[in-house]
Amino acid sequence: MLRKLAAVSLLSLLSAPLLAAECSVDIQGNDQMQFNTNAITVDKSCKQFTVNLSHPGNLPKNVMGHNWVLSTAADMQGVVTDGMASGLDKDYLKPDDSRVIAHTKLIGSGEKDSVTFDVSKLKEGEQYMFFCTFPGHSALMKGTLTLK
């Protein structure tokens, strides 16, 4: 009886990490103006969520730079428009834009960047979009982020 109890306890402990919420995602932005995903789900049990962005392409950031920006769906176009006006030296983001929930820096070929944000900034039922603010990229490089 004790052996069975010990075996069940051990299996429970070993499977716990498999049931834990995934509180990060790895995303790539390539030279074809594409993210490798168009949907991210954030588990509401996560206190923080991390996005790891990489650029496996060959082009530099002044030609094919990518960033990862999160806002509400309603704010996306305004963030993109104001970002284009801000220019390359500001990573195509308006400084201190309150509509931006989280963002990485602009990266080019072979570069990486990460951003971690508090999940408490997200509201269940709100529509969120992630996108790239490099001029012209948001038409293709975008996706949804959902809190569940």
From Swiss-Prot:
Pfam families xref list: Copper-bind
The terms describing its cellular component in GO are: periplasmic space; plasma membrane
Q: Which domain of life is it from?
A: Bacteria
GO molecular function annotation: copper ion binding; electron transfer activity; identical protein binding; transition metal ion binding; zinc ion binding
- Sites binding Cu cation sit at 66, 132, 137, 141
Q: Where is the Plastocyanin-like domain?
A: 21-148
- Residue span of the signal peptide, if any? 1-20
Question: Which of UniProt's keywords are assigned here?
Answer: Copper, Disulfide bond, Electron transport, Metal-binding, Periplasm, Signal, Transport
Any transmembrane segments, and where? none
Report the function annotation for this chain: Transfers electrons from cytochrome c551 to cytochrome oxidase.
- Write down what this protein is called: Azurin
